[in-house]
Every structure is written in structure tokens, then in C-alpha cells.
A protein has these predicted regions:
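Ligand/cofactor-recognition surfaces for anionic moieties
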Residues: 4-1020
Length: 1020
């Protein structure tokens, strides 16, 4: 097959031809030649258009290097998530205040001599964009208002656009015309032309001298609506971008004359347009979009999975940014009051009179805190068990980390934020993978004479002083920050004086080393520290303390060297941006500092690592045991959402878990690379082999095909073993599939994803567009989008029937969290895939399935929880936490946007799994919609985000997903009427959807319905 026609592009060649050069800062992996079989030999021939592409781009970089800065033009692209509201989500970027970042970059450009006239700050930038309506048309923004208010950066004439369009390949032109009509755009099947005014294409944006700021065009829909009819990408996952999308990028290159294109933040949609995974051709839409413009991409250093896609599919040179400062979530309001009552109870529980009164207060506070759904507190439950469960629940919340606002590009943490940042790095504890690098928590625990492993494992246990292990962990965290604060504030930063100070007892405060520690009764009154020579004169502790202090000094230095804006300006001049590693800084990857580099990922041949295998074994064991407790039987089939972050963040813990469930174990070469696997004998395994149904992310599919092949080969090997069916569920299910008509190979297909070249699960799009009527619709959409099989010699074969058959035996679905930097409300893909997989499994099997969520934040103490419990933890620690909310409020429009997106994802989880408690929706309503202070915040900064939240809440109630008290519902409705009046004033004239929720499923759209009928037959 010609490499141009291979849907996946490169596969086995990725490692040596693409990934390895990235380690040295190599960019733009463009294929310029390929092998072709001739009569008697394999010839190598150039690919003409690719050679032209490469040389054109090289010339652009060379020209950039020679150009004076006052003549350099820069185009900034702010991302947008139409499905979460175009008006509400301008500048979408994970954990980055993109608006303030762009403003500061423009100011630095002005200082460096660029001809730019920057806005005062990020607020002025977003206010200008919104007042001009320099965005795509959507619910509250008709095209005539965009033009009237000055949002049009340019009008592209039909004839001008056709010169570019007609130069595209015939297949590309045909696909675009079939979807969006002839240039400049026409109504097709009731879907209007995208951004066309008086037969001209409207390009939106705001100009600041030699810089423009544009909001990325919508992807896959058109018009001032959002419903199942206009959401064309739902009907066709491979739908090409609109004429206006293509025209925008060509205007920036050819008419505005951008020398550099800068996509701001993680992440946009250009790199996820249809086309090959890597090694793109002229028919791939990311390649068409980027053209020949040098491309710099501001990206979060903790996101190698998606950053790699941007590098390989949109030819981006990344300039990574620092991760957001993390801080302890802590307890608040009724949770803090419950904690106080529990502490008081431990002090007086032998006083019957006071104990009796406190019991009632504790039970009342448990109910008030909405913990009664997790803590059984009836007459049959011993009160000590209630107390234990309460401490356990509070421990999960108080010791979770949360984001302290957002990062601003080029701004390094200072003062207390620097202390928090360094502490979040040093607290990671995994003795096996960190070698001799002890965590600061383990050091402090050792100084206190405590066992950190015991504290983490059982946070409900009460010590002799009446404190729970969860409270002790919180105190250890506080002491850790005291030590860091002392060291970075010490003028001389002498290790010897710091270490001496820790062990000098009463002289501690006098020396001015660390009054906070010496005055802490947990330390100063602890004889283990100050009167016990075994500790105070322990050379091992002194050595570990010295090692921690050296790491603090090193981290502080590398934080200071994170010159992000300087690196970006370096790129503006066509200069080299050094390569650097990437990953989760709270997972031990502090080598991502300093930021401002072009990050690379990892060597996939080493996955899973030996440490990850141990974690994966634990995960599989805990999952099986939990299912045994819940259902009194082994799970026959577990449905997995396997993401690329498992490979890049966790070294393949999830991959190892899948292998362990199947009953195989990795075999490594002496250099640590994976050689293959071996079968674990049933006698040694001690349980049946568990089958798996894996929905793999498109990023993992495209960048780590070797990992897919290992799992696929393991499934085939296990299914062919000569073992009893009741001890080998993969074999049992494969035999059943053969009886139903599958061939031998088809019966072992267990790894599925979206069609090659596409990257969504479909379900999140349907949920956001209200394009579903019931769970069956979501199940059908999941099957329609994800019925393509992958594995050894299987590259995206259509396999809807095999997916449906495999889903019939799924007993539980699973995903996991590996760090507090990300959680299940952090992206719509979590509910779109995991929730969609759950809905599809329920519909295929005709029964409920368990929804589980793993937790490897502490790799040596893994947990598997019910999804409902994980949702409660995440909502309490972040979304409803006043500390997190205040951090978001510091970022105005962008903070309001991020709050709204999280609320939308709560709705998405309920729509797809029905695992969200009513009290969560109640508290969201009270906290964000009805609270006067919060309403003012949204009204002043981002009223569109408030409207989006309130509308979703009302939709949840109308669909029966939430059952609020009548009084609360009435307040919400009244508030929404007021919000809607604000919106109508902002919208102006013209036709627009506004706040109307129009439920349009595939049954209501003939073209879409025809495609879905076959899917419904398969699933039913």
C-alpha cells in the first residue's frame, strides 16, 4: 500500500524516525520519500509535494531569522470549545490564564522592539473581543452582530478564496463541498453556511499592530445554534473543517502575512482534524491548515500525550509552560466543623453526658455535609464505625491537592506560592521508582517517629493523642512547608546550619532557623525529636535532610531559570528552542524544570516499567476483590478507558493492570526494554483470567502502537490456552463469538477506538449539543464512533459487531487518577469515553454494570472506588471548595470559564452514568447561581459562563437527572430568567438560539439516522 493511502501514516517507524529526533529538539516530521517495489528491487522515491512542503517551511524559518523584529508579524490563536459555549470559552487552555498570558507576551514584544500596541491586560483583551464579537457565531452571537460590532478582522471574497481552494487535491475539495457546499459556503441538509456574510467569508479577530489575536474557528458545526442538527461532526466523525476554518488560516498566512503562528495553551483543534496520525500527506487537514507558517505552540509541560500530537500533526515547536501551583485542599465549612466535633469527641468520649450530646451533633453534621450517602449512620451501625468512616472521608478530602489559581505564561511562583510549588514536588513518595530520593513527607514522618505508609494506608486510625492519621498527614504537610520556607528564606542557605537547627531543641527559635517548626507542639514537645539521641544524632536522618535541602535549592534555581516568554521570543526570531522532558511534576518529574523548552515524551519500549508492573498487579487485585465484595463473583470482563497519559504519566500502570487481569506478566530485556510477556499458570494466578474490553485513546493508538500490539497478542495467547472456560473468560467469550458467526481472529478483538484519523468518542458532543433523548441514544453514538478495532496487523478495521458482542459481558468499567494535577472533571473526554463505555455496556448487556475508578496517587497504596465516591471527592476538594473557587476568581473571565466547564462535566457524568448525587447539583446551584457575590463575579467577568451553567442545571432537572426541592428549582428558574435578560441585551439583533434547549437526536436528522440504523440493529 502506498504510504499516502495508509490511514494511520507511520506505525512501526514512529520510534526511530520521529520520536528519537524529538529528544534532540527535532521538529516537523514530514515524510519526503518512501519505498516502492519495482520489478526486481525496492526503490526509494521522493514524494514531490512533501519535498516542496519541507523546503517551503525551511525557507520560512530562515527568512524569520533574518527579519528585523519591528517587521515580524505574529498571529495568536486562542482556543475555543464550541460545545461548552463559544462565548463562554474563549481562550480555553488547561490550567493557563491564556488571556493575561497573551497580554504580557505582547507587552514584552513591545519592549523588545516589535511594532505592537498591546492591551492593558488580559481583561481588556477579552472585553475587546467580546464587545466586538470577534468570535464564531453561536447561541448568542448571530453573524450580522459580528459584522456590526467590528468583530470581522477581514472579509474574504469568494474569488480570492477559490484560488486557494481550487489548488487543494480533488479528494479534499470533494469532501469539503459535500459537507459545507461550494465556496464560500452553502446550506446543506438544513445546516447553514459557516460565517458567510453577503457572500463573503468572515474572518474574526482583533489587531494590535503587527500582531493579531484570533479565536480559533468552530470545528464541525455552523450557524448561531447548538443542537443535534447543526452538530455535523456527530453525524460524520471525519467531517472536514468548514470553508471559513480553512480561509482563516490562509488569511493569516497570505493576507495578514504572519511570520509565526502561536497557538496559546493546551489545546486547540487544528492538530485533531481528520488525517493520518503521523507522517501526514497533502490530504490531511492539519497539514492543510498550518500551511507553511512557522508554528510555535504554548503548551503545558505536564501534558506529553496531547503535546506530542501537536508536534507531529500540526508541525508545532512547543514552548512549554510551568504547571499550576498546587496546594492542600483542606477542610471548610461543615466539613471543618465535623472535623472539630470529631476531635472533641475523642477528648470526651469517656464522659457519657458530653459524649451523648456530641454523638447527635456529629450525626447532624454528617448529614449537613452530605456524607450520609457514604457513611451508614443508623441504629445497626456501631458509633465507632461511624467515627472511623467519618475520619476516612475527611482524610480523603483534606489530603488531596488542588490548583492554586492558574499559571500565567512567563510568571514564576514567588513567596508562599513558591513554597507550595516546591512542596508539591517533594511530597511525591514512591521509594521503588525514586531510588534514593526520599520524599519530604517521609523525612518529616521519620523525624516524628511515624510510619508514613501506615498513615496513608489507614487515615481513619486514631493515635494516642486523639488525632487521626489523616490529621497527622496534614500536619506533616504543614511541617514540610515550614522546612522549605526556612531554607529558601535563609540568606546563606547553608545546609549545615539548617540541619543543626532541626535538632537543637530549645535553641531552634533563637537561631532564627525555623520558628514555625520549633513552636509547633507536635515537634517541640515530642521527646522523639529533641531528647532522643537516636533521632537527633542519627546520621541517616541528617543525610536525608541534607538531600532534601539540596533538592530545594536545586528546584528553586530551576524555577528561576524558567524563562518562558524569553524562549517564545527566541522562537519569533527563528532561533533554536532546546528540547526537554515532560510529565507530571507531582509524579517525580521535576526534570521538566526549567520550562520554556520544546518537550519530548518517552521511550515506549520500556513500558510498562517494573515499578508500574507492581502497581498494576495491585490495581488488578484490588479491583477483583472489590467486585467480589460487591457482586459475590469474579468479574468476567472489565471495560477500560486506556489513555496515553497512562503511558506518559504512569509508565504503563494501566497496561500492567490489563496484563495482570489477563494472567500474563511482562518479560524485560537486560536494558529495561519490554521483550514480551509470559503466561502466568492458573495455579499461580489463583483466580480466573479476566477478559477486557479496551477503548483506547486516539493519541495512544497513533503514538504507541507497540503497546496496543502487546495487549492484543496477550489476549490472543490467553484465549487459545487449553483451560476450562470458567477459569479463562477471554476464551469463554471468544468461543461464544465464534458461535455467533465471528471468525477466529475477530473473536479475539478487544481493543477499540474511533476511526483512524479521528479523536473523539462522540458521546461528549451529543451530551453538550443535547442531541440525545435517552441512554440508548448515547450507547448507540458510542458504538457508532468507536467500533474500529486495533492490534497486531489490525489498523482500524470496522468492528461494530465485535465491540457490541464484547460489551455484552462487561461487568465493570474502569479508569484511574494518577495525580491531583488532573481529575475526572478535568476534561470532557473522561465522561465521554468512560461514561459512554458504561452506557453502551449497560445497553448491550441489558443490566447494570459497576463503574469503578482507581487511584494511584500514592503508588504504594492503590485504591479502587465506586465512581460515585470519586465524584464526591473531586467535587468536594475542588469544585465546591472556597479555596479553589477564590483561586479561580483571581483570573476573571478565564476563572469563570473553568468553573463553568467543570459544572458541565458533572452534568456529563450524570447523563452517561447516573452516578452524581442530587446534593451535588443542589450545592452547585446554591454556590454559583444563587449566591449574590458569585453572581456579581460572573456578571462582571463572564455572564455567558453563568448562563451555560444555569441552563445545564435546568436541563438536568427536565431530563430527570436531578430532583431538586421545589423551592430551590423555583429560585433557579427565576435566576435564569434574569440571566437570560442579560444575554438578550448582549446578543443584539438577528436570529439566534439563545437559551433554548432543543433536543434533536439522530432520529430527527434523516442523513444521520440512516447511518445509525445499522448500529441500532447490531446493539439490539
Amino acid at each position: 500500500m502506498c504510504i499516502r493511502d495508509r490511514s494511520q501514516g507511520l506505525s512501526t517507524e514512529i520510534g526511530w524516525s520521529v520520536a528519537l529526533p524529538e529528544y534532540e529538539g527535532g521538529i516537523e516530521p514530514i515524510i519526503i520519500g518512501a519505498g516502492k517495489a519495482e520489478e526486481n528491487y525496492m526503490g526509494r522515491f521522493p514524494i514531490q509535494d512533501r519535498c516542496s512542503k519541507l523546503t517551503s517551511r525551511i525557507l520560512k524559518w530562515i527568512e524569520l531569522r533574518k527579519k528585523p523584529v519591528d517587521r515580524i508579524k505574529i498571529a495568536f490563536i486562542l482556543h475555543n470549545r464550541p460545545c461548552t459555549g463559544v462565548e463562554a470559552s474563549i481562550g480555553d487552555a488547561a490550567n493557563l490564564d491564556s488571556l493575561e498570558s497573551v497580554s504580557r507576551i505582547l507587552h514584552r514584544m513591545q519592549e523588545a522592539g516589535y511594532s505592537v500596541d498591546p492591551p492593558r491586560d488580559g481583561k481588556e483583551l477579552i472585553d475587546t473581543i467580546l464587545s466586538k464579537k470577534a468570535i464564531s457565531e453561536f447561541r448568542w452571537t448571530p453573524i450580522n452582530e459580528i459584522v456590526k460590532n467590528g468583530g470581522a478582522l477581514a472579509f474574504v471574497e469568494k474569488e480570492e478564496y477559490e484560488k486557494f481552494f481550487n489548488a487543494l487535491s480533488p479528494s479534499v475539495r470533494q469532501k469539503v463541498i459535500e459537507s459545507w457546499g461550494n465556496p464560500p459556503g452553502e446550506e446543506v441538509n438544513g445546516i447553514p453556511a459557516a460565517m458567510v456574510y453577503e457572500n463573503k467569508i468572515v474572518v474574526t479577530g482583533v489587531r494590535y499592530g503587527n500582531a493579531v489575536v484570533c479565536v480559533q474557528p468552530k470545528r464541525g458545526c455552523a450557524g448561531s445554534r447548538c443542537d443535534g442538527k447543526v452538530c455535523k461532526i456527530l453525524h460524520d466523525p471525519e467531517v472536514p473543517p468548514t470553508h471559513q476554518y480553512l480561509a482563516t488560516y490562509r488569511y493569516l498566512e497570505n493576507t495578514f502575512g504572519a511570520d509565526v503562528l502561536v497557538h496559546v495553551g493546551t489545546h486547540g483543534n487544528l492538530e485533531f482534524l481528520p488525517g493520518k496520525g503521523v507522517g501526514l500527506s497533502e490530504d490531511c487537514y492539519p497539514d492543510i491548515g498550518i500551511g507553511t507558517i512557522p508554528h510555535l505552540y504554548i503548551y503545558n509541560s505536564d501534558n506529553p500525550p496531547e503535546g506530542t500530537i501537536a508536534k507531529r500533526r500540526s508541525l508545532a515547536c512547543l514552548v512549554d509552560h510551568m504547571q499550576t501551583v498546587m496546594t492542600s485542599g483542606g477542610l471548610y465549612e461543615s466539613l471543618a466543623e465535623l472535623d472539630r466535633l470529631l476531635g472533641e469527641y475523642e477528648q470526651v468520649k469517656h464522659d457519657r453526658g458530653r459524649e451523648h450530646a456530641l454523638k447527635h451533633l456529629i450525626l447532624d453534621e454528617i448529614k449537613k455535609s452530605n456524607l450520609d450517602s457514604e457513611i451508614r449512620a443508623d441504629h445497626e451501625t456501631p458509633f465507632e464505625e461511624v467515627i472511623r468512616k467519618a475520619h476516612e472521608a475527611l482524610g480523603r478530602i483534606r489530603n488531596s491537592q488542588i490548583h492554586h489559581g492558574m499559571h500565567i505564561f512567563g510568571q514564576i511562583p514567588e513567596g508562599e506560592k513558591k513554597v507550595e510549588f516546591i512542596n508539591s514536588i517533594l511530597r511525591y513518595d514512591d521509594k521503588e521508582s525514586m531510588g534514593n530520593r526520599v520524599s519530604i513527607r517521609r523525612l518529616i514522618a521519620e523525624i516524628l517517629g511515624l510510619d508514613l505508609d501506615e498513615l496513608i494506608t489507614d487515615q481513619s486510625r486514631i493515635s494516642e493523642n486523639g488525632k487521626s492519621n489523616g490529621q497527622r498527614l496534614e500536619e506533616i504537610d504543614s511541617l514540610s512547608k515550614d522546612l522549605i520556607r526556612t531554607f529558601i528564606n535563609s540568606p546563606e542557605k547553608k545546609l549545615s546550619s539548617i540541619i543543626r537547627g532541626i535538632f537543637t531543641g530549645q535553641n531552634f527559635a533563637e537561631k532564627g532557623i525555623n520558628p514555625a517548626i520549633s513552636q509547633n507542639p507536635e515537634v517541640s514537645q515530642n521527646p522523639v525529636i529533641f531528647q532522643n539521641p537516636e533521632v537527633s544524632q542519627n546520621p541517616a536522618i541528617s543525610q536525608k535532610t541534607a538531600a532534601i535541602c539540596e533538592r530545594v535549592l536545586d528546584l528553586e534555581s530551576r524555577i528561576e531559570k524558567s524563562l518562558e516568554i524569553e524562549a517564545l521570543l527566541h522562537g519569533f526570531e527563528g532561533k533554536y528552542i532546546p528540547a526537554g522532558p515532560s510529565g507530571l511534576i507531582m509524579r517525580g518529574r521535576d526534570d521538566v524544570l526549567p520550562t520554556g523548552r520544546n518537550f519530548y515524551s518517552l521511550d515506549p519500549r520500556r513500558v510498562p516499567t517494573k515499578a508500574a508492573w507492581r502497581v498494576g498487579q495491585q490495581l488488578s487485585g484490588v479491583l477483583v476483590d472489590k467486585h467480589l465484595r460487591d457482586e459475590k463473583r469474579y468479574p468476567e470482563n472489565v471495560g477500560f478507558y486506556w489513555m496515553a497519559n497512562d503511558i506518559m504519566w504512569a509508565d504503563g500502570e494501566g497496561m500492567a493492570q490489563i496484563m495482570s487481569l489477563l494472567g500474563v506478566e511482562p518479560v524485560w530485556l537486560s536494558n529495561g526494554q519490554l521483550k514480551g510477556f509470559s503466561i502466568i499458570p492458573l495455579k499461580e494466578l489463583g483466580r480466573p483470567r479476566v477478559d477486557v474490553t479496551v477503548r483506547v485513546s486516539g493519541i495512544l493508538r497513533d503514538n504507541f502502537p507497540n503497546c496496543l500490539e502487546v495487549i492484543d497478542e496477550a489476549i490472543q495467547a490467553v484465549a487459545s490456552l487449553d483451560e476450562p472456560e470458567e477459569m479463562n473468560y477471554p476464551k469463554k467469550h471468544s468461543l461464544r463469538m465464534i458461535e455467533e458467526g465471528a471468525d477466529a481472529r475477530g473473536s479475539t478483538l478487544r481493543i477499540f477506538s474511533s476511526k483512524p484519523g479521528t479523536y473523539s468518542a462522540g458521546v461528549q458532543l451529543a451530551v453538550y449539543a443535547s442531541a440525545w433523548k435517552d441512554e440508548k441514544d448515547l450507547a448507540d453514538i458510542f458504538l457508532y464512533w468507536n467500533g474500529y478495532a486495533y492490534g497486531k496487523n489490525v489498523k482500524g478495521e470496522e468492528a461494530h459487531a465485535q465491540l457490541a458482542s464484547s460489551l455484552k459481558t462487561v461487568d465493570a468499567t474502569f479508569n484511574k487518577v494518577v495525580s491531583d494535577e488532573y481529575d475526572l472533571l478535568g476534561c470532557c473526554c473522561y465522561f465521554g469515553v468512560h461514561g459512554g463505555l458504561t452506557a453502551a455496556a449497560k445497553q448491550a448487556s441489558g443490566r447494570d454494570v459497576r463503574v469503578y475508578f482507581g487511584d494511584t496517587r500514592e503508588p504504594q497504596h492503590v485504591e479502587v472506588r465506586d465512581m460515585a465516591d470519586e465524584l464526591r471527592r473531586v467535587v468536594r476538594t475542588r469544585l465546591l471548595n472556597p479555596k479553589w473557587i477564590e483561586g479561580m476568581k483571581q483570573h476573571g473571565y478565564k476563572g469563570a470559564q473553568d468553573i463553568s466547564k467543570r459544572v458541565g462535566r458533572v452534568y456529563g457524568w450524570e447523563a452517561s452514568t447516573q452516578e452524581v448525587d442530587d446534593w451535588i447539583f443542589d450545592d452547585i446551584t446554591k454556590t454559583f447561581v444563587l449566591d449574590e457575590e458569585m453572581r456579581r463575579f460572573f456578571e462582571e467577568n463572564n455572564p455567558y459562563a453563568l448562563e451555560e451553567m444555569a441552563r445545564r442545571l435546568l436541563e438536568a432537572q427536565s431530563r430527570g437527572l436531578w430532583d431538586p426541592d421545589p423551592e430551590l428549582l423555583e429560585e433557579l428558574k427565576n435566576s435564569y430568567l434574569e440571566i437570560e435578560s442579560w444575554m438578550e441585551e448582549l446578543a443584539g439583533d438577528g436570529e439566534f438560539q439563545g437559551g433554548s434547549v432543543d433536543i434533536v437526536s439522530f432520529e430527527d436528522v434523516p442523513d444521520w439516522d440512516r447511518k445509525m440504523q445499522e448500529i441500532r440493529k447490531i446493539l439490539r
